[in-house]
Regions:
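C-terminal motif of bacterial Sec signal peptides marking the signal peptidase cleavage site
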Residues: 20-22
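Bacterial signal peptide processing site
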Residues: 24-26
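Active-site-proximal beta-strand elements of phosphoester/diester hydrolases
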Residues: 67-77, 187-198, 220-222, 280-286, ...
Length: 353
């Protein structure tokens, strides 16, 4: 009995020692292959989920096209000759409303003054244009009243025009009378021509070449002599054949010279498939000597790329009146007129999806 209990105690002590030794000894077993594989895959996934640092700049998000406005004036010679403040009130209003309308360009389609020999008329025009805010593009197209006779090449117009973007490299010839400018507005590439009175026809090939060079730009043709109340002037009849069909990116033509306001739309068939491919919106404005109804009228052309429209607003800051009473035969735009098929979507600065 005593020997049996002693043997049992020794056996239990030996078993405890063996268990203690097994637990304290370092593990010496191999990890199963499938476990190794899972652990490696997990480590690789963690490594891939952490991107390497890059020095490439983050691209700017694409901006949505926004509406922008062109302020259009013409034939202000009666105002500058009379020493009146009408012209100045027009440009001051354009400046005051720039932010609300997002006005990016002020255009004058000629006959800024009545007599190009009179320095005081030029001084009046300079004072009026000076009211336009810095940063706004300004383009003028010389009219017949703005130029001295052909034999006198030193026309004061070149010394007094307020054009902000004139570049001799963009001029038709060494006189610098006709030229073009480019800029971006509202997400659209813009190309604007200034064609001086008397150079319209000889500059036709040049206009077509520039339009081809800037084929991705929305082209606006600004000149003095092009239309009248009944149709096209002799110059306009030539340009409608030599320029408009050859330059598919021309979508707007602005002119003055003849009395009244008028609108014609041309719809050229550019690919000769028997269907119109674009609309060319052509407008004429000259109401400066209508003492009763026309004092101080200008037009705002609001371009909306999203809607592909041009809203034409007719307003006189002098009379504080919208809508000009157009003589018989003229346009009937009234206070506001929306022109569809502006063609703006073809010339966006961001690629279309």
């Amino acid at each position: 009995m005593h020997k049996t209990r002693t043997a049992s105690i020794i056996s239990l002590a030996t078993l405890s020692l063996l268990l203690f030794t097994a637990c304290a000894a370092p593990a010496n077993h191999e990890v199963r292959p499938e476990v190794k594989s899972a652990q490696s895959a997990h480590a690789a996934a963690n490594q891939q989920s952490t991107p390497e640092p890059t020095t490439e700049p983050t691209p700017e998000p694409a901006t949505e096209p926004t509406a922008f406005t062109i302020a259009w004036m013409s034939d202000t010679q009666a105002y500058t000759a009379a020493d009146s403040d009408v012209f100045g009130k027009m440009t001051q209003w354009v400046a005051d409303t720039q932010a609300g309308y997002n006005t990016v360009l002020a255009v004058h389609t000629g006959d800024i003054v009545y007599n190009a020999f009179r320095e005081y008329e030029w001084n009046n025009s300079v004072a009026a244009f000076a009211k336009l805010p810095k940063g706004m593009h300004i383009l003028t197209a010389a009219g017949n009243h703005d130029q001295l006779p052909p034999e006198n090449k030193e026309t004061p117009y070149l010394n007094h025009r307020p054009d902000t973007d004139f570049d001799p490299a963009h001029a038709f010839d060494k006189t610098g009378l006709s030229y073009y400018m480019t800029f971006e507005a509202g997400g659209v590439h813009i190309l604007v021509f200034s064609l001086a009175y008397g150079q319209e026809l000889e500059a036709s090939d040049w206009v077509n070449a520039v339009c081809k060079q800037y084929a991705n730009h929305y082209a606006i043709l600004c000149l003095h002599n092009y239309m009248d109340l009944g149709g096209y002037s002799s110059v306009g009849r030539r340009l409608i054949k030599s320029v408009i069909p050859q330059s598919p990116n021309i979508r707007v033509v602005l002119c003055g010279h003849e009395r009244g306001m008028q609108y014609f739309a041309e719809t050229p068939d550019d690919d000769a498939d028997g269907k119109p491919d674009r609309t060319v919106h052509q407008m004429m404005m000259n109401v400066q000597d209508d003492a009763e109804n026309g004092v101080g009228f200008l037009r705002l052309l609001r371009f909306d790329p999203a809607m592909d429209t041009i809203e034409v607003v007719t307003y006189s800051p002098v009379l504080d009146r919208y809508g000009y009473k157009v003589p018989v035969g003229g346009d009937r735009f009234g206070e506001r007129k929306t022109l569809n098929d502006a063609g703006l979507r073809d010339f966006l600065t961001q690629e279309k999806p």
